[in-house]
Structure formats: structure tokens, C-alpha cells
């Protein structure tokens, strides 16, 4: 049975909150990998984008970057084989955060070594000395933070960056000789990620989410919600039909987004913790579970 229009809109709001991190992560990936390899601040898929200075007020890729660590980022696609990340020995804080396609922190690499970042179902052999790290989604965002004491310390950070390696397992086992493929630049993929997502129609948004869920499976904890949302065709591989939304859908969609901005900001504030003059976001940050409004 098709639910009535009011029930549909309640589900649409729930589904939007649920899928927003997935769709926004994909838009961020599309922008960040939109390069032929020559653009500052971007790199093709499975390749490093090493920052050469600290983030400042002009930094726009993500909110609230650190200002005492230099970032080395890479967008990984491990759908066909694991990627090997080699983290060198360093004399300072340097760790790798692995974010999945839903913005959960799947793993943190904080010791020197070679790590094979793999999907749980991958069944190949790893060479000696390579540590397997299972992650839940084919799209992963690796964010490496290397601390520095000031601009005069930058050459030391560059030396660490040069020793980092990222290459497919098949290239690693053949001795590490690897020429990364050249990327491609498309003008239509030059956008501000959050603006791109907010400008999507209902069909664009939910069908993007449905396609992404096929390669970046939802967590087991999401099963109950997805069972409910299947009534409006939101879920891996489904096709969302905007006809469900009834008349005046475009206007109502705009109103819904405006309303969500206010309520989600208030909901997010509930997780804020004060420490003297500092504000930070507490649990379950990084492993959000079913706290979909966080």
C-alpha cells in the first residue's frame, strides 16, 4: 500500500536526514578528485593530495580544519582490490583517519607500517609485514594529520609526506613500482559540495543515495529504518518516484529543507560539550550509529 501524502513527507524528511551524509560525502569526493593532477588542493582517486601549508580562513573544503597539523588526503576506491597505505616512521604526531562513505571513522592508523585497506569480503593473500584493515564501504576518505611547530618546520613535514605511499595491492606486491593514472577535469564538477546537494531535486537526491548504497552498504543498525523507508523506495538499488510527493512538491521540498536546517542545528547543539572556553562535540562522534540527526 502506498502511504498517504502526509506520511510520505514525514518519511521523506527522515530519509533525507539519513542519506544526507552519504550524498554529501560523494559530492565532496567528486569535487576533490576533479582534476587532471595539476590543481592545488585536489588529486585523482587513490592518490595523495598533500597540503603544503596550514589551513587558514580561506580553507573551504570542510568545516573547522586543524590549524596545527598539515593535511594529506586521499579518496580511496577499494571496490576492485585493497589499497596499501605505507605510513613512515616519524618524530612527531602523525596519524591517518579513515572515514567511510557515511562519515563514520572506520579506523585510525597511528603506527608506522604498511596497511592493506580492504572490504570485509576480500579473500586474497597479503605479503608479510602488511596489516589488513577492514573497512565497511568501497569509498573511503583518508585524512592524515602531521603536526608541526611553525612554518620553519614545514620542510620536515614535506619529507614525511614524500615517504608516504598509496598504491594498489597488485602494484605493492610487484615491488612498489607504480605510475598512478592521470585524472580528468570536468567543469560541471566544480561546485561547493553542500550547495550542490541542497540544490538537488527529490528524485536526484534519493536516486543518488540509492545508487551509492549499492557500493557503500548501510550499517546493520540501519535495517529497521530502511525497512520503513522502503515504502517510499529509498534503499540500495531502488528507484525513487517523485510522483509520491503529490502536488506542490517543489515548494514543499524547499520548505522542508529550510525547516531541517533549523531543527538539525538545534539537534546538533545537544552533543556539544564545553571545556573551559572550548566547545567540542562528544560521543557518538565518529561512530554515529542511529543518531541520524548528529
What is each residue range found by the language model?
Residues 2-294:
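A compositional/structural signature for long, glycine/proline-rich flexible linkers
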Amino acid at each position: 500500500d502506498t502511504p498517504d501524502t502526509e506520511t510520505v513527507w514525514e518519511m521523506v524528511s527522515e530519509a533525507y536526514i539519513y542519506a544526507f551524509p552519504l550524498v554529501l560525502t560523494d559530492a565532496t569526493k567528486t569535487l576533490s578528485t576533479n582534476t587532471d593532477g595539476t590543481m592545488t588542493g585536489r588529486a585523482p582517486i587513490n592518490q595523495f593530495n598533500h597540503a603544503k601549508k596550514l589551513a587558514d580562513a580561506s580553507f573551504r573544503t570542510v568545516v573547522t580544519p586543524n590549524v596545527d597539523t598539515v593535511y594529506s588526503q586521499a579518496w580511496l576506491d577499494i571496490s576492485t582490490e585493497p589499497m596499501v597505505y605505507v605510513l613512515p616512521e616519524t618524530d612527531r604526531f602523525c596519524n591517518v583517519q579513515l572515514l567511510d562513505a557515511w562519515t563514520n571513522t572506520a579506523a585510525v592508523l597511528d603506527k608506522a607500517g604498511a596497511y592493506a585497506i580492504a572490504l570485509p569480503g576480500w579473500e586474497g593473500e597479503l605479503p608479510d609485514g602488511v596489516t589488513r584493515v577492514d573497512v565497511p564501504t568501497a569509498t573511503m576518505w583518508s585524512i592524515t594529520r602531521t603536526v608541526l611547530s611553525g612554518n620553519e618546520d614545514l620542510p620536515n613535514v614535506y619529507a614525511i609526506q614524500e615517504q608516504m605511499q598509496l598504491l594498489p595491492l597488485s602494484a605493492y606486491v610487484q615491488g612498489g613500482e607504480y605510475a598512478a593514472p592521470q585524472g580528468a577535469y570536468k567543469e560541471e564538477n566544480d561546485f561547493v559540495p553542500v550547495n550542490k546537494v541542497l540544490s538537488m531535486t527529490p528524485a536526484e537526491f534519493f536516486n543518488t543515495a540509492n545508487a551509492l548504497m549499492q557500493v557503500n552498504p548501510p550499517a546493520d543498525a540501519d535495517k529497521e529504518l530502511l525497512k520503513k523507508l522502503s515504502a517510499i523506495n529509498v534503499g540500495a538499488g531502488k528507484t525513487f518516484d517523485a510522483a509520491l510527493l503529490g502536488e506542490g512538491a517543489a515548494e514543499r521540498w524547499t520548505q522542508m529543507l529550510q525547516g531541517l536546517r533549523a531543527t538539525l542545528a538545534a539537534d546538533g547543539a545537544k552533543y556539544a560539550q564545553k571545556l573551559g572556553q572550548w566547545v567540542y562535540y562528544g560521543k557518538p562522534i565518529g561512530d554515529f550509529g542511529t543518531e541520524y540527526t548528529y
